[in-house]
Structures are given as C-alpha cells and as structure tokens.
Amino acid sequence: MAAPSDGFKPRERSGGEQAQDWDALPPKRPRLGAGNKIGGRRLIVVLEGASLETVKVGKTYELLNCDKHKSILLKNGRDPGEARPDITHQSLLMLMDSPLNRAGLLQVYIHTQKNVLIEVNPQTRIPRTFDRFCGLMVQLLHKLSVRAADGPQKLLKVIKNPVSDHFPVGCMKVGTSFSIPVVSDVRELVPSSDPIVFVVGAFAHGKVSVEYTEKMVSISNYPLSAALTCAKLTTAFEEVWGVI
C-alpha cells in the first residue's frame, strides 16, 4: 500500500537498505488539484489505450498480460501482443519519478482500452517491481481506488469519462505520433505560463486516435517507446521551465 511522506529529503542509504516500492512523495511546491479548470503552467499527460484488464485465474484475479496469459488470450481470439501492462508501468515510472512531477508541474491520467479512466495523484510513487504494480492495478480496477496506508488520501482512483472534462479550460491538446512527417522540437511546444495536454499511446502497435486533440506531432526521427516519449516530454519541459 502507500504512505504519505512529510517531504522528499534525499539521503544516503546503507548497502542493504532498499527504497520503499509504494508510497507518497509530496511535490516541493503547492500544485493545482487534478481536474482543476484554472490555468497555471503544468504538463498534463494522458496515457491512452493502456492495457489494464483483470482476468480470473483459479480463485484469484490477475492483471492480464501476454507473458502469463497467452493461452487465455488465444482461446478468446485475441492478439497476445495487445496485453502489455508493462508499457503503462514503465511510462508511469518515467513520469512520476521526474523532477517535473516533484516540482508540482505534472498531472497524469490513464485511459484504458476498456474505457476506464484513472487519475494518478502526483504524490504517488509507483512500485518498482512489475508484480507489485500488477497487484495494485488489480486492486484499483476492482475497488476503484487505492488509498494511502495511513490516511484517507487516494493515490489512484477511477474517475468519470471523458478525460477532456478534467482538462483546464482552453488548454492546448497535442497528440504524439511517429507517422507525422515533420519532427517537432518539444521545447518549442512548451508554453511559458499555460497548461498543455500531451497524449501518449500506451500500447505496443498502432497510433493515438482521440477526438479532442487539436494537433498531432512527432518528436523524433525514430519510433519511440511510450516510456521514452514520456521521458523526452518531461525533460523538455524541465529545461524550458528551469526545473533542475
């Protein structure tokens, strides 16, 4: 489970000490709440088409993935390559660990293939191991929220669609795609003081296709994983906004 912290204070660890896999790390600066319609600079990332789906195995539920449940997927006529929750896990690690998030300038939403919309509390620290991540996603999808271990704070919660209802009014909404012929420098897309939404595909194959984006951009001459796309986005915003 998760536990809120009094503050993020780097320190030295002894050789055998391990970091907690799941807890809450408050941003250094106060931030606008998720879904706040007021302006103020921040990057909003939507992980679109995430493969987060539970399957019953015996008497328990597990997070469907291509490695453990290939036979189940094939039996139901589904492509095993589509069941890739690891893509969402890797992307969340990149986003939530970023200095941009620690500075209180990032908000993340996850929209799954099954049309479930998830809000990620900026104070959440994602589990490092995939097995623990899977367990928490199963809990989230069945109970609709994951709370901090020692308080009422919700670190992950299922919210109402559409995701566009949770964006600040009038903000730019940008989709990412390798198929766009002209490559854009992300730093040139960073607004000086306004919020902006970037949509990143959290799937193995295909392209982002949502109705609410106003433009599509390519940010590299090469195909990028979702996690690397997230890393390039947060790094560019950190450089322009002076987050070190």
Curated annotation (Swiss-Prot):
The keyword Phosphoprotein applies. Changing D86G: In BWCNS; studies in fibroblasts show a dramatically reduced level of EMG1 protein in a BWCNS-affected patient compared to normal fibroblasts although patient fibroblasts do not have complete EMG1 deficiency; the mutation increases dimerization of EMG1 subunits suggesting that aggregation of EMG1 leads to reduced levels of the protein. It is found in: Nucleus, Nucleolus. S-adenosyl-L-methionine binds at T176, G201, G206, I219, S220, N221, Y222, P223, L224. One of its GO terms (molecular function) is rRNA binding. The record marks D86 as: Stabilizes Arg-84. It is linked to Bowen-Conradi syndrome: A combination of malformations characterized in newborns by low birth weight, microcephaly, mild joint restriction, a prominent nose, micrognathia, fifth finger clinodactyly, and 'rocker-bottom' feet. The syndrome is transmitted as an autosomal recessive trait. The prognosis is poor, with all infants dying within the first few months of life. Belongs to the class IV-like SAM-binding methyltransferase superfamily. RNA methyltransferase NEP1 family. This is Ribosomal RNA small subunit methyltransferase NEP1.
